[in-house]
């Protein structure tokens, strides 16, 4: 299954706010109206919608998300929490959380076009897994910095999660640590996502 490129508002109306996909928000009560029209949700549908939330927010294909679930399942600790850590530490998501992009697809484009360096080297892989003490900078060229400055100016001021530090004037972000669960930027029940995949096998 390919990455979703359809109408974004249609997705947030069904699944709720997906800040990584779009800055738009569903109207208050729209999800309740949808639920009343379709009747009581089955447990399968509830798990499916949580999985879809995760997939659309982070901009992943079905195959990519399944791969992350399998990696998380082999790691120590809670599979759901490890899954969220893996997704949150992707380079495209780190740029989004720093405010250097308004959405994760936008952050992915910055990376794909060679505007972003990690520890002084250009990284053009959006799924690159950032680690504590990684330094993310914008390429020292006028077009790269003007592009990111415009995005920084356009992004709504939000408190940075505690695992990140932003030095705006240096066009630089620092990864301080692995993200805490409470700082994840999406309202999600990750256990339902793990359950969804465990029942598919």
Swiss-Prot record:
Cystine residue pairs: none
Major localization listed first in the record, in broad terms: plastid
Domain S4 RNA-binding stretches: 89-152
Single GO cellular component term: small ribosomal subunit
Listed SMART domains: Ribosomal_S4, S4
Function of the molecule: One of the primary rRNA binding proteins, it binds directly to 16S rRNA where it nucleates assembly of the body of the 30S subunit. With S5 and S12 plays an important role in translational accuracy.
Keyword Ribonucleoprotein: yes
This protein's name: Small ribosomal subunit protein uS4c
Family: Belongs to the universal ribosomal protein uS4 family.
Lineage: Eukaryota, Viridiplantae, Streptophyta, Embryophyta, Tracheophyta
Location of this chain's protein in the cell: Plastid, Chloroplast
Any Gene Ontology biological process: translation
Cited InterPro entries: Ribosomal_uS4 (IPR022801), Ribosomal_uS4_bac-type (IPR005709), Ribosomal_uS4_CS (IPR018079), Ribosomal_uS4_N (IPR001912), S4_RNA-bd (IPR002942), S4_RNA-bd_sf (IPR036986)
Region: Disordered, residue numbers: 20-44
Gene: rps4
Lineage top rank: taxon: Eukaryota
Pfam families: Ribosomal_S4 (PF00163), S4 (PF01479)
Keyword annotations from UniProtKB, A to Z: Chloroplast, Plastid, Ribonucleoprotein, Ribosomal protein, RNA-binding, rRNA-binding
The protein's assembly and partners: Part of the 30S ribosomal subunit. Contacts protein S5. The interaction surface between S4 and S5 is involved in control of translational fidelity.
GO terms assigned for molecular function: rRNA binding; structural constituent of ribosome
